[in-house]
Amino acid sequence: MPIRIPDQLPAADVLRTENIFVMSETRAAKQEIRPLRVLILNLMPKKIETETQFLRLLSNSPLQVNVELLRIDDRPSKNTPTEHLDNFYRQFEMVKNRNFDGLIITGAPLGLVQFEDVIYWDHLKTIMEWAKSHVTSTLYVCWAAQAGLKLLYDLPKKTRKEKLSGVYHHRIHKPYHPVLRGFDDSFLAPHSRYADFSPEYLAEHTDLDILATSDDAGVYLATTKDKRNVFVTGHPEYDPHTLHNEYIRDLGEGMEPAIPVNYYPNDNPDNPPIASWRSHGHLLFSNWLNYCVYQQTPYDLDHFSEEAFTKDE
């Protein structure tokens, strides 16, 4: 939440240079509060598991958040009961005429599938295009980050020879950027993907602010200048055993997956994994909600426009 101080307090300018949200008394007197509206487009097969993971992170904020769940189409799901989808998920036709403060697009197990071969690719493009004029800030996670970069920057799909799986060290590059508020200089986060996000490639072909990278995993966190698009190439939402379950699944399917890096104590899958990224995940989502959504979104979403975004005074 912002701190409220007298309009002319000298500390205000110093704090603003560090991108700390300072609210003047003049602005505070005019402010009204309402719940944030966040839409989650859940592309993962196990939707109940995934929605729980994201809701857990969204809940760790002093802001009131009203969440709605969106499905990409009406095809039957092999992993989620139809009753659950019918009761709790919206179709795009039900929300397309409304505006939202935030949109989260989850990952999807499509790392080796070309974009044009994804059965719902055209529909996903429609939703991402719709978000430009109906959503204040969109958070793209893992495969969705790759899809978003394709649609926004026309970046081709780049794939690693071996799947990236494990918990990797990352370092931050713009310590005063709002999304990095409170981050340690180095932090851990899980990855599970084939996509390759080279820092040099993204720096050359986009105007993104690259906020965090890993020597092994490449770019982890990047945003557009206006913070309306935030890309997370890993899985900060993962539960402690998610990587383990994926590893066991791949073994059961006759594959030869590598043991997830920096995950099991002594690299022994018989040892229960330790979740070393939980605090990072909560902080990342709290910062996204606060700095990319709450501080930028218009109070009256029915009159959404880029000009209506909150500006610092």
UniProtKB/Swiss-Prot annotation:
The record marks 111 as: Important for acyl-CoA specificity. The active site is at residues 142, 235, 237. It is found in: Cytoplasm. Pfam families: HTS. Gene3D superfamilies: 3.40.50.880. Pathway: Amino-acid biosynthesis; L-methionine biosynthesis via de novo pathway; O-succinyl-L-homoserine from L-homoserine: step 1/1. This is Homoserine O-succinyltransferase. It comes from the Bacteria. It is an enzyme of class 2 (transferase).
